[in-house]
UniProtKB/Swiss-Prot annotation:
Belongs to the ATG14 family. It comes from Schizosaccharomyces pombe (strain 972 / ATCC 24843). Residues 7-21 are annotated as: Cysteine repeats. The lineage of its organism: Eukaryota, Fungi, Dikarya, Ascomycota, Taphrinomycotina. The keyword Transport applies. This is Autophagy-related protein 14.
Amino acid sequence: MLHVNKCQLCETRRPSICESCLKKQLYDFYHKRDEFSRDIESELEKVAKLKSESFSLKGKITQKEELTYRLQNLAASLNEKKSLSCDLHSRKQLIEDDLSNRKKSINIASQKLAGLSHSTSDYFSKEYLTAYRRSELLQNKLHEYQKKLITRVLDMYQLHWQRDLVLNTQGCTQKSAQMGSEFNPDSIDSSLAYRLSKLSMGNSKSDLSHSDNETGHFYSNFFSQVMELNASVTISGIPVCIRSKEKMFLNPDCALTLSFICIFLAQYTSIPLPCPLQLPSPDQKPMTSFSSEQMLYIMYNIVWISWNCGIFSFPRGITQSQLFELMQYTGFWLVQLRTKPLTSQKPDWHYKMGMDFDLFHRLYLARLPIPINYSSLRSRSSSKPYQLIS
């Protein structure tokens, strides 16, 4: 309760109070209240300042603690770095010492090997040359054995052709007349392939030393002789090719025999056949007919074996139609396999010989749009080819 000086009347008449004294008391009360409120606000401001200062101090304390922790980590990392640098220096020194020791040992070993290198290189070079010559001899022997096997297979199936064939070429007629009865007909037959393969040695027309007319005349003359030779070839007494309507076809009576010949030659020369062959199993009766595709398979397989054996190389100037015509003369290819030697080059199976079977088949269909009935082309009874097999 505020203590204010009262008038005498109010002092005597307690607890009553007059209006003037009441005003004084109220004035004093509001005045005191304002002072208290100002004091409270100032104190609140001080408290707020103290709070902000305490927050800043707390942040500084936290930052100080973090810095202290980082300093401790930095000191620990510095100590670790010093220890690692010491270890690295020691390891570096050990490696340098090891390298110096190894260099010394290498120098000593190189000095020792210097005296032996010359003799060792001579020894290995001699061994390499010896092995290379031995491999060449073995390769030549292998080709000789393969050639003997090819000859025996073709002789076993009684391959024959016109032995007294005289070529219409310069030099061959004179040679046959000079040698008389001692003349070897195999050399004449093999020269057919030689004369055409000789054209493949040149890279351009200028290398052939022939004009276009002379080259065309040579091709026509050569193909006429190939046709004459092909028409005279027989297997087991049966013509390999027969003519029908001025076109040459593979004799179906020889299909089974030629299939066995292809299999034997591919086995003895280690040449994979590009086309499958159809053979009867032992418990089946002999096949009475072959399909047109089987006949094409046989023709293509024989040309494939001849080409991969190095018997014949197609010239660069030959056209596609001429190549297709030449590949159909199966008798000619059999004669080349019988008369010409094998080459020593290893064939590349991934290299195409100029015409794959798909192109060969398409050209055949274009030449004969109507499939031919091979049963109508038989030269004699179908039981004839199976006599030798049985």
